[in-house]
């Protein structure tokens, strides 16, 4: 995770009746500002913090496709069904759940023959499991069966976690910076008064993997604006 520096602004409100003069005015008498502090006014520190978090793809799909042609519907259906059942059995042996796969079939007639095409689509979250399944299918099935290369992507759960994580990291970075600033000013950092995410972006974070296999990643950035109240250190000490 890469974190960029925060921009910090501290506002220490003056006490009632404090007078500020413009030093640029001749004799300092030309411009006078009087600030009246109300009962509800408070000392504050305002911080803009940012963070960046990257996350690789957490899902991949692999498709297994094949077709056959026969003179009768029963023959082509039985041929395709046997192959589909073998593939499903292999997937079950490797603990692939039923909700993680779909099977589609399509039959049509051309040139006095019946043609059937089948496609088995599998979603993997365990990439080691995916590799083992692909090796078995490539070894056991003939060349008429096509096993695709994995297509990696980010699930909605992964993207949601990424967005929350980068925002929390930006807020934490802002809090640490505000704590350092308040300590430097001789104050104690109080409760947050305002937290606002000002900017959130996502971009392609590059690809991981060897030649032919690319596992993409996404980089998310967040910039937040946070206001904390400041307390005098003396007020935090217990009276003896």
From Swiss-Prot:
GO cellular component term, pick one: cytoplasm
Pfam hit, one: SIMPL
Localization of this protein: Cytoplasm; Nucleus
Annotated InterPro entries: IRAK1BP1 (IPR030312), SIMPL/DUF541 (IPR007497)
GO biological process: immune response; positive regulation of canonical NF-kappaB signal transduction
Top-level division of the source organism's lineage: Eukaryota
Keyword line: Cytoplasm, Nucleus
Main location: cytoplasm
Family: Belongs to the IRAK1BP1 family.
Function field: May be part of a signaling pathway that leads to NF-kappa-B activation.
PANTHER family attached to this UniProt entry: INTERLEUKIN-1 RECEPTOR-ASSOCIATED KINASE 1-BINDING PROTEIN 1 (PTHR18842:SF2)
Protein name: Interleukin-1 receptor-associated kinase 1-binding protein 1 homolog
Organism: Oncorhynchus mykiss
């Amino acid at each position: 995770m890469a974190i960029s520096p925060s921009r910090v602004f501290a506002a220490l409100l003056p006490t009632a009746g404090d007078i500020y003069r413009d030093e640029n005015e001749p004799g300092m008498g030309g411009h006078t500002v009087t600030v009246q502090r109300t009962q509800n006014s408070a000392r504050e520190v305002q911080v803009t913090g940012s963070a960046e978090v990257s996350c690789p793809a957490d899902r991949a799909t692999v498709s297994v496709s094949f077709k056959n042609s026969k003179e009768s519907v029963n023959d082509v259906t039985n041929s395709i069904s046997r192959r589909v059942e073998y593939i499903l059995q292999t997937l079950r042996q490797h603990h692939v759940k039923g909700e993680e796969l779909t099977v589609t079939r399509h039959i049509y007639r051309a040139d006095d023959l019946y043609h059937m095409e089948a496609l088995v689509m599998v979603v993997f979250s365990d990439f080691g499991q995916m590799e083992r399944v692909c090796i078995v299918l490539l070894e056991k099935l003939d060349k008429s069966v096509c096993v695709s290369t994995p297509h990696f992507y980010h699930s909605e759960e992964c993207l949601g976690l990424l967005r929350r994580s980068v925002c929390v990291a930006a807020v934490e970075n802002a809090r640490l910076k505000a704590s350092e600033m308040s300590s430097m000013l001789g104050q104690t950092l109080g409760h947050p008064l305002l937290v606002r995410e000002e900017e959130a972006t996502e971009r392609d974070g590059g690809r991981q993997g060897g030649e032919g296999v690319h596992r993409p990643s996404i980089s998310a950035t967040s910039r937040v604006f946070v206001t904390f109240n400041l307390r005098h250190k003396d007020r935090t000490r217990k009276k003896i």
